[in-house]
Amino acid sequence: FFMQILYHFPKVVTNNFRKKYDVIPWRNNEEEFKKWCNGETGYPMVDAGMRELNKTGYMHNRVRMITAGFLCKHLLIDWRWGEAYFAEKLLDYELSANNGNWQWAAGTGCDAAPYFRVFNPESQLKKFDKDLKYIKKWIEDFDELTYPNPMVEHKFARERAISTYKKALN
């Protein structure tokens, strides 16, 4: 699917598929981006995913969606930053799939998740890794009681993302 999109709309390599999203005022905080890259967000599912990616060059699709959504919606960092990082790290990297999935996560793509869909990393953890097997595999010293606090509170980040998108699109 995304190969066809890329073939017919080559502009998606560097631009939003849906032009109306060009007005989103991304925060693009470099320190927050570094923490995301290093798996130091304070959200175990996001952190485990990024650590797995950095160590192996792989990440399960569900975790790719969670980490991508976190970067774009919780941190309001331009999807192109994350797309470039994944392109550099993924062993199974393929341009059209990487691009299309990042635009899906950011809400800017042809079949994107709506901008108001903001994954809760804690709910995703409970739903997909309730026994913490994945977390403990990639965060070796994981301890729920001493794990660092989230770099941004989910409720605040969700409301900020929805408000930012809504203001920009109206």
Q: What is each stretch, according to the model?
A:
Residues F1-N170:
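C-terminal catalytic domain of photolyase/cryptochrome flavoproteins
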